[in-house]
């Protein structure tokens, strides 16, 4: 059953398509093909370097360290779409994240989320999970199961290493 609780939504019964159709460019210009991650859980977060939620990079890295042995794929998607809070180049974003948070999870290049130039992944999120799931700000989070289906989303205020999220990741890993 679909359920709406605060800033998250359980959408297992609504989602029909999987994420394996989508590609991103990495912060280093290489291809990130989600099809390469079939059979693994995926956690996607839209990010920004100058946001009040930027501290969540540390929480995301904590997830990376905790779950990398279980195959969790984490992808951060820097964007300047919300409050112009991203740095001016991919190189600056990479340096910022390395120096300040020592991240080891994947980052895409700076990516459009909103509007006509918005990445197809986010259009898919809106189609599959509804308007509320579409990012309204930085640090929206999307949890995808081993079949490539979007099963949960979380708004900016939900910390990546919260019990809400880690409990769901644990469930997916055990499937």
Task: Indicate residue ranges for each PLM-predicted region.
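Single conserved hydrophobic/aromatic residue that forms the stacking wall/gate
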Residues: 1-11
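N-terminal "domain-start" segment that seeds a small globular fold
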Residues: 12-35, 55
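Proline/glycine-enriched tight loop/beta-turn segments at coil->beta junctions
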Residues: 37-41
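Amphipathic alpha-helical repeat scaffolds
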Residues: 46-50
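Structural microenvironment flanking redox-active thiols in thiol-disulfide oxidoreductases
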Residues: 53-118
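Thiol-/selenol-based redox modules, centered on thioredoxin-like
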Residues: 120-123, 127-175
């Amino acid at each position: 059953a679909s359920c709406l609780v605060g800033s998250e939504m359980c959408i297992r019964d609504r989602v029909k398509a999987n994420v394996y159709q989508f590609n991103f460019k990495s912060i280093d210009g290489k291809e990130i093909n989600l099809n390469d991650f079939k059979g693994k859980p995926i956690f996607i977060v839209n990010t920004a370097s100058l946001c009040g939620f930027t501290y969540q990079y540390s929480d995301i890295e904590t997830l990376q360290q905790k779950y990398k042995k279980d195959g969790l794929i984490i992808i951060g998607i820097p964007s300047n779409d919300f409050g112009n809070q991203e740095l001016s180049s991919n190189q600056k974003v990479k340096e910022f994240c390395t120096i300040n948070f020592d991240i080891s999870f994947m980052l895409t290049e700076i990516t459009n989320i909103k509007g006509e130039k918005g990445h197809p992944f986010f259009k898919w999120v809106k189609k599959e999970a509804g308007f509320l799931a579409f990012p309204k700000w930085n640090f929206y989070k999307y949890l995808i199961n081993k079949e490539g289906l979007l099963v949960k989303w979380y708004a900016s205020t939900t910390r990546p290493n919260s019990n809400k999220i880690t409990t769901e990741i644990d469930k997916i890993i055990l499937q």
